[in-house]
Amino acid sequence: MKKKAVILLSGGPDSTTVLEIVSKMDYEIYALSFNYHRRNSPEVQKIQGLIKDYNVKQHRVINIDLQSFIGSALTDDNIDVPKFKHTDQLPSDIPVTYVPARNTIFLSYALGVAEVIGARDIFIGVHTNDYTNYPDCRPEYIKSFEAMANLATRVGVNGEKITIHAPLINMTKEQIIKKGLELGVDYSKTISCYDPTEAGLSCGQCLSCIARLDAFKKNNVQDPIKYV
C-alpha cells in the first residue's frame, strides 16, 4: 500500500517541480491549493490544467480570506505590486509582497489534511532565493514547523512522525528550472506572476516574474509562458 503525501501546490514552477519529483516516488498524492485573493486566482486556474498531467489522488482548493492581513500587495487592493526591470533592482529585504504568516497558514491546513487522510509526509517548494525576502521559507522555519507539528498533533503524541519535506530548499531558482527541465516539467502550464492580467498573462516586471525570467535565461531556455 502506497504512503500518502500532501503537496502544497501554487501553480508556480517551484511547487510544480516538487510535484514532478514526488510523482516519481512511491506516494499517493493529495495536492492542496489556496484561493485567497483576485491576484492569485490565475494560479488556481492554471492548476486545473496542470494537475491533469499527474496521477493525483485528490486536489483540494481551499478558499480563505487573507485580506485582513492589510499591508501586503498580494492581499490589499490599495497597494500596488512593485515593478522592476532587472534582477539587480530586486529588494534585498522583506518586500511589500510578503504576506504575514502565509506559509504557516498553508502548512497548518496541510497538517490538518494530513492527519485526516493518514499522511505522514508534507511537501513544500521553498528554495534559497526565498530566504532573504520571505522568512517563512527559511530552513530554520521548516524545521521549527515540523517540530511543532509533532508536538501538537495526535499523530505526534502517539509516537508517529510527521515530516515536512522541502526538496528544493538548497537550490536556486536557476537550479530548480534546470532540474525541472531534466525531469520533463511542462512549465508552459505554470504561472509565477504577482500581478497577472484578468486573462492570466504575466506582467513580466514583478519580483517573481523577473526571478523566473532570469532563471530561464541562465538555462538558455525561452520561458514558455505569455507575458503582457
Swiss-Prot record:
Catalytic reactions of this protein: 7-carboxy-7-deazaguanine + NH4(+) + ATP = 7-cyano-7-deazaguanine + ADP + phosphate + H2O + H(+)
Entries under Pfam families matching the protein: QueC
EC number per UniProt: 6.3.4.20
GO biological process, one term: queuosine biosynthetic process
Cofactor list: Zn(2+)
Residues that bind Zn(2+): C193, C203, C206, C209
InterPro entries: QueC, Rossmann-like_a/b/a_fold
Keywords: ATP-binding, Ligase, Metal-binding, Nucleotide-binding, Queuosine biosynthesis, Zinc
Binding site for ATP: L9, S10, G11, G12, P13, D14, S15, T16, T17, V18, L19
Alphabetical list of CDD domains matching this protein: QueC-like
Gene3D superfamilies found in the cross-reference section: HUPs
Biological pathway: Purine metabolism; 7-cyano-7-deazaguanine biosynthesis
Free-text comment on the cofactor: Binds 1 zinc ion per subunit.
GO molecular function: ATP binding; ligase activity, forming carbon-nitrogen bonds; zinc ion binding
Family: Belongs to the QueC family.
HAMAP family: QueC
Purpose: Catalyzes the ATP-dependent conversion of 7-carboxy-7-deazaguanine (CDG) to 7-cyano-7-deazaguanine (preQ(0)).
Protein name: 7-cyano-7-deazaguanine synthase
